[in-house]
A protein has these predicted regions:
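N-terminal membrane topogenesis motif
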Residues: 1-28, 81-89, 124-126, 203, ...
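Interhelical loop/hinge segments that connect adjacent transmembrane helices in multipass membrane
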Residues: 1-9, 186-187, 203-247, 289, ...
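Membrane-interface junctions at transmembrane-helix termini in multi-pass inner-membrane proteins
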Residues: 10, 137-163, 186, 353-385, ...
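Transmembrane helical elements of multi-pass membrane transporters/channels
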Residues: 11-31, 191-203, 207, 222-292, ...
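Helix-loop junctions and terminal segments of transmembrane helices
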Residues: 32, 61-77, 148, 152-153, ...
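Interfacial/gating helices of multi-pass transporter permease domains
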Residues: 33-55, 86, 189-190, 224-231, ...
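Interfacial segments at transmembrane-helix termini and the short loops linking adjacent helices
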Residues: 112-133, 325-357, 430
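Membrane-proximal transmembrane or re-entrant/amphipathic helices at the cytosolic face
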Residues: 432-433, 456-512
């Protein structure tokens, strides 16, 4: 990895971490205010509408991801004409997508009540609220959304993150004040499209300032169109699997169990997403750099980097999983003021931790799938995960409720995400045996389980309640697993390579 790629990754990581901190803390405050000022049914509605709109966003078909992938090469060789043509193409596509989302969203209006089992607040017009959420989604496509793709391909995700940090901070603060002072959910929701407009206008301004030579004009060649079409078909199924995994669960719980259960599930999922978001932030900051590396360096070099990055990330994943196991229930108990009716069982909590480990273990591998453009080759895997998750979630959810929904998600991730996608990556890009990669993962899993059992047992002996107990358990979670990991890995080749890489990043060596 060249010095420029390290520099870009470090810059993107710094801004992304700031954004992630904002995305964790401020929404938590807003979420808490909704629960305490309005009630769990309002939080359930928020989760349901958000999930529905994420499903509608499948209309994107993955054009942005496909175009960003195609942009890597012309950007690397300085072909601005092709870059401008691709941006112009994406601009036209986004306008069409916005129209389609609006049309489908309006068609769904009469069916909203069938997605809610039981009651919802009498004073709420669910159709009006839904239309506000829908307008927010449509605006995000119509107003300069294509400029975000340009900044990402240019390895300047730090710019979009800085804008998002400012806009989201402002929005969450305004929403919190509105909820605290007025307790009005309509006023809270109306700020979503308002701040989306401001965000997209700022992205346009910054993009024009940093890359004035890139304007949407020209036409792409037929060969590029064919390549985009091929990639989009694969990316769409990838998006389908991700959306089904992240949103179908909420819709299934709402339709089979009710809004209160959605609120409880989403409280745990919010914590899950916050920690997963941190892990995703770290890996996503490397995406453009990995894509550039795949475009300019050999397969063997990239394979060695995959093994090295997987080791580093597995250590991080293990730490996060152990922290979740030990701190999930104590934190929710403090958050919900000891109300056990708003808490999941310990078994479901452990399922959430398992869910976190299996999905986060795929993060580094996903960088190489995206960077090598294997979306088309993985179309069947994506489709099977999506279809499997939908079917299993409804079947197991019907019989076992939230437990069944979580089990369905874990099963489909292991079968069609971890195992299936690994096989395709090694067969189509690395073209070598996957044995070494799986041996590493088995070792990392075994060490994580031992670590987790030991740390959880020690934490269970701490009977101090409240924030003091949380802090003590957090210190235990940060010390014992790291010490055991260091003991196990210190003399291994993986540790030495990882340490050398981390050291080179911080002292800005030219090569790793």
């Amino acid at each position: 990895m060249s010095d420029s790629r390290i520099k870009n990754s470090k810059r993107n990581l710094k801004s992304a971490i700031i954004l992630q901190i904002i995305n964790i803390i401020l929404p938590f405050v807003v979420r808490t205010l909704i629960l305490y000022k309005l009630g769990e049914e309002y939080q359930g509605l928020n989760g349901l509408f958000t999930s529905i709109l994420q499903v509608l966003n499948l209309t994107d078909l993955g054009f942005s991801s496909a175009v960003v992938y195609i942009l890597y090469k012309p950007i690397a060789i300085g072909d601005n004409d092709t870059v401008c043509a691709l941006i112009s193409y994406l601009k036209r596509v986004y306008r069409i997508i916005g129209i389609v989302i609006l049309a489908i969203g309006l068609i769904l209006l009469p069916f909203l009540k069938f997605l809610i089992k039981g009651s919802y607040p009498d004073e709420v017009n669910i159709y009006l609220l839904y239309l506000i959420y829908l307008s927010n989604s449509v605006i995000s496509y119509w107003l300069f959304a294509y400029k975000t793709a340009l900044l990402l391909a240019m390895q300047r995700a730090d710019l979009t993150d800085k804008i998002s940090s400012i806009i989201k901070s402002s929005m969450f603060i305004v929403q919190a004040v509105v909820l605290f002072v007025f307790g009005n959910y309509y006023v809270y929701v109306i700020f979503l499209p308002i701040f989306s407009i401001i965000n997209n206008l700022l992205v346009q301004f910054v993009s024009k300032k940093y890359f004035p030579q890139i304007t949407p004009h020209g036409k792409i060649s037929e060969n590029i169109k064919k390549e985009i079409t091929k990639q989009v078909k694969g990316v769409f199924f990838n998006k389908l699997s991700n959306v089904c995994r992240n949103t179908i669960d909420t819709i299934v719980i709402s339709s089979l169990v009710g809004l209160t259960s959605v609120a409880i599930y989403n409280n745990y999922f919010y914590i899950f997403t916050a920690i997963y978001g941190v892990s995703l932030t770290v890996s996503n900051c490397m995406q453009a750099s990995v894509g550039n590396s795949i475009a300019t360096e050999g397969v063997e070099r990239n394979y060695k980097n995959l093994i090295k990055f997987t080791f580093i990330f597995s250590w991080f994943t293990s730490m996060c999983t152990i922290c979740l196991c030990c701190l999930y229930q104590p934190f929710v108990k403090v958050w919900m003021s000891g109300n056990k009716n708003l808490m999941l069982s310990d078994f479901n909590m452990f399922l959430f931790c398992t869910y976190f480990y299996v999905i986060t273990s795929c993060n580094i591998r996903n960088l190489y799938i995206s960077g090598s453009g294997l979306f088309w080759e993985l179309r069947l895997s994506y489709f099977m995960e999506a279809a499997g998750n939908i079917i299993l979630s409804f079947v197991l959810g019907y019989y076992f409720g939230v437990t069944g929904v979580l089990l369905a998600t874990i099963i489909t991730i292991v079968l069609f995400n971890f195992l299936s996608r690994n096989r395709v990556l090694f067969k189509s890009y690395f073209q070598r045996t996957i044995k070494e990669y799986y041996i590493d993962h088995v070792l990392y899993l075994f060490v994580t389980i031992v670590n987790c059992i030991l740390t959880y047992t020690i934490c269970s002996l701490i009977h101090i309640e409240g924030m003091a107990g949380l802090i003590i358990k957090l210190l235990i979670c940060l010390s014992i697993p790291n010490a055991l990991n260091l003991l196990v890995y210190f003399k291994t080749k993986r540790f030495k390579e990882a340490f050398k890489f981390i050291k080179s990043v911080f002292i800005r060596k030219n090569k790793i």
